[in-house]
Each structure stands twice: as C-alpha cells, then as structure tokens.
C-alpha cells in the first residue's frame, strides 16, 4: 500500500516519503519513463520493476503486514503476494537510505519532458 511505503521510508530512510520521493527524477512518483537520473531515481526504477513482477494482488492498494525486529523491517503475513509488495517497499526504502548522500534537489519536481530516452529493461 502506498501509505505503508511512505511509512517504511520514514522508518528506514528517516525522510518524508511523499515530500522527498513523490516527485523526484523520472521514476519516483506516478509513472516512469526514460533513464533514471541518479542513484535515488534508480531506486524508484527498481521499485517500479519490482511492483511489475507482483501478480495476484495490487501493490499500490493492498495492505500488508510487517514488524520491526532489532531495527530491521521484517515482512510477514500469510499472503505471499502481499509479502512480496512489502519486500519491494522495504528494499526501496533501504535503497533511499543508502543513497541519501547523492540525493540532488535538482531532480525534485524534475520536468518529465527530460525523461524521453528509451527505458532500459527491468
């Protein structure tokens, strides 16, 4: 669920998910095309690809379960599809955290007109 994704970003990357990543580069936020602009945008590209591999549930709307154990996010629940969504979200939040040092404000509200190059395959 997109709100849960925001929660995981807050917990893991210590950033407001929607504010920092809702409108960043060519892939962070709704849709995505072109070439990822930097490491953070690549996190979103990989997250989009991850969602694209999920079958049997709706990554943007289905609610999943997770817990925090020793500072780590552990995806759980009986539904393997929802667990997969959680893992996509968790991995993206970790990617954001690991690339905070290269986050570049010039890609915040990046004009989509610059995202015209052919997308690379997932």
Swiss-Prot record:
UniProt xrefs under CDD domains: PLA2c
GO CC annotations, alphabetized: extracellular region
Cofactor(s) listed in the protein's UniProt record: Ca(2+)
Disulphide bridges, residue numbers: 26-115, 28-44, 43-95, 49-122, 50-88, 57-81, 75-86
Subcellular location: Secreted
UniProt binding sites for Ca(2+): 27, 29, 31, 48
Main location as per UniProt: secreted
Molecular function via GO: calcium ion binding; calcium-dependent phospholipase A2 activity; phospholipid binding
Listed SMART domains: PA2c (SM00085)
Catalytic activity: a 1,2-diacyl-sn-glycero-3-phosphocholine + H2O = a 1-acyl-sn-glycero-3-phosphocholine + a fatty acid + H(+)
InterPro entries: PLipase_A2 (IPR001211), PLipase_A2_Asp_AS (IPR033112), PLipase_A2_dom (IPR016090), PLipase_A2_dom_sf (IPR036444), PLipase_A2_His_AS (IPR033113)
Function: PLA2 catalyzes the calcium-dependent hydrolysis of the 2-acyl groups in 3-sn-phosphoglycerides. In vivo, is non-lethal to mice when intravenously injected up to a concentration of 30 ug, however does show significant edematogenic activity at the injection site.
Family: Belongs to the phospholipase A2 family. Group II subfamily. D49 sub-subfamily.
Quaternary organization: May form tetramers.
Designated name of the protein: Acidic phospholipase A2
């Amino acid at each position: 669920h997109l709100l849960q994704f925001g929660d995981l970003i807050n917990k893991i990357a210590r950033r407001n998910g929607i504010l920092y990543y809702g409108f960043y580069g060519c892939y962070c936020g709704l849709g995505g095309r072109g070439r990822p602009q930097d490491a953070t945008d690549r996190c979103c590209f990989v997250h989009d690809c991850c969602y694209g591999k999920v079958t049997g549930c709706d990554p943007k709307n289905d609610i999943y379960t997770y817990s925090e154990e020793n500072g780590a996010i552990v995806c759980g629940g009986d539904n393997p599809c929802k667990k997969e969504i959680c893992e996509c979200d968790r991995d993206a939040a970790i990617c954001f955290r690991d690339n905070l040092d290269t986050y570049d404000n010039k890609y915040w509200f990046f004009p989509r007109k610059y995202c015209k190059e052919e997308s690379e395959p997932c």
